[in-house]
Amino acid sequence: MGMYLLHIGNAAVTFNGPTPCPRSPYASTHVNVSWESASGIATLWANGKLVGRKGVWKGYSVGEEAKIILGQEQDSFGGHFDENQSFVGVIWDVFLWDHVLPPKEMCDSCYSGSLLNRHTLTYEDNGYVVTKPKVWA
């Protein structure tokens, strides 16, 4: 089982789902996470199946200084990174919407988000990180 952590502000929830690094180098795990401020409900989907729902920080508002951190656990917002707690593998695409998607859309492979365009992001790589376009669909 894989462990997925979602941090909202200084609150966090943990989901146990499929291992994020399949044995075949060409297989992938499709992961979707939603969080709604009004209810505080976070939902994790993996490979089109609901993994679970948990409450995390109802009413929290994401500020202008928000950061999206992928593949690295932090002990606190803005805290330090530990290379022994790093994701090892490939992240192909990242999309972000300004609303919670309905379950049907959450299960589908989506093509773009409404808030995040990874091609216009500023990246900060820590350790050995390679950023390249994907070579297969």
Swiss-Prot record:
- How far does the signal peptide extend, from start to end residue? none
- State what protein this is by name: Putative mucosal pentraxin homolog
SMART domains given in the database record? PTX
PANTHER family to which the protein is assigned, alphabetical:
C-REACTIVE PROTEIN-RELATED, MUCOSAL PENTRAXIN-RELATED
Q: Which family does it belong to?
A: Belongs to the pentraxin family.
InterPro entries for this protein: ConA-like_dom_sf (IPR013320), Pentraxin-related (IPR001759), Pentraxin_domain (IPR051005)
**Calcium recorded as keyword:** yes
Provide the tissue specificity. Answer: Not expressed in the intestinal tract including ascending colon, descending colon and rectum. Not expressed in the human colon cancer cell lines HT-29 and CaCo-2.
**Coiled-coil annotation: which residues?**
none
Which positions in this protein are listed as binding Ca(2+)?
E73, D75, Q85
The record's GO molecular-function terms, alphabetically, read:
metal ion binding
Name the Pfam families for this protein. Answer: Pentaxin
Residue ranges annotated for the Pentraxin (PTX) domain, each copy included: 1-137
Q: Which domain of life is it from?
A: Eukaryota
Q: Which UniProt keywords apply?
A: Calcium, Metal-binding
